[in-house]
């Protein structure tokens, strides 16, 4: 009923909503997600939120996602390979609907495939969006800025 089932009459919906309000009931987001294909949650990882570019990018992402009814879980992974992988795995365990990686550090060093394998593995479970980084693979979506041109302008 709380998930908006069309099989529940309007009269019953109103009664249930009144009882919920009267008792200050808040639905459990995890229990709600059990019956749905979506948790309406996006995981966002950046290396360091203290960086002004990262902070602005994350603030814009979060604001935009909230306008579409999505909650966000933010993680600041640092730059170490193991830490980045741990954050990705932690967010995947939270049943996120998609993963957004902010910053070129997630694209690896360009020499070793292994350092981005964890991203391709994550993309097998949920869509992965990379901002200012590029990794090739299925279910991976990348947007890159031309930093040199931006500096010139």
Predicted regions and their residues:
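Alpha-helical recognition/docking segments in bacterial nutrient-uptake
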Residues: 36-153
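N-terminal helix-turn-helix DNA-binding module of bacterial transcription factors
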Residues: 1-39
């Amino acid at each position: 009923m709380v998930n908006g089932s069309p099989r529940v009459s309007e009269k019953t919906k109103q009664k249930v909503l009144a009882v919920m309000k009267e008792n200050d009931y808040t639905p459990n987001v995890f229990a709600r997600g059990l019956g749905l294909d979506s948790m309406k949650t996006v995981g966002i990882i950046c290396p360091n939120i203290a960086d002004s570019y990262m902070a602005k990018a994350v603030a814009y992402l979060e604001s935009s996602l909230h306008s579409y009814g999505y909650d966000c879980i933010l993680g600041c992974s640092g730059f170490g390979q193991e830490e980045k992988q741990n954050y990705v795995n932690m967010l995947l365990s939270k049943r996120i609907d998609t993963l957004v990686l902010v910053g070129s550090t997630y694209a690896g060093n360009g020499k070793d495939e292994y350092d981005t394998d964890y991203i391709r593995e994550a993309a097998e479970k949920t869509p992965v969006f990379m901002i200012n980084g590029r990794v090739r693979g299925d279910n991976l979506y990348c947007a890159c800025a031309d930093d040199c041109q931006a500096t010139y302008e």
